[in-house]
């Protein structure tokens, strides 16, 4: 059964994965830009704490990209195409899973409504 914590958590997760995809796109677009520092979005621990606290909702600030502290190359850039590609695949799959879970929850609600 769908509850507000579950819905909030799925919405927050999809927002976080979307922000992560945007950060990855920015990183790949700046792969040859001298002194560019890769961006990353770290929202998973905040989401886990929010769910544990009974909310599941996260503020927009939780999805703000931060600069990566990974070592830089000679030109001062720290974007790794292999790391970004793997992160893009992982994030896409996680977004897809959260989206499917939300769809399933809404389908159950619709079925219950039709039966009553």
Task: Report residues per predicted region.
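Amphipathic alpha-helical polymerization modules
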Residues: 1-116
């Amino acid at each position: 059964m769908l509850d507000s914590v579950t819905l909030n958590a799925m919405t927050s997760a999809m927002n976080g994965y979307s922000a992560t995809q945007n950060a990855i796109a920015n990183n790949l677009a700046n792969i040859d830009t001298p002194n560019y520092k890769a961006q990353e979005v770290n929202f998973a621990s905040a989401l886990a704490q929010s769910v544990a606290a009974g909310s599941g909702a996260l503020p927009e600030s939780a999805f703000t990209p931060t600069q990566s502290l990974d070592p830089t190359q000679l030109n001062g850039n720290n974007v790794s195409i292999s790391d970004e590609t793997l992160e893009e695949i992982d994030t896409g799959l996680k977004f897809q899973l959260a989206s499917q879970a939300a769809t399933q929850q809404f389908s159950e609600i619709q079925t219950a409504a039709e039966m009553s």
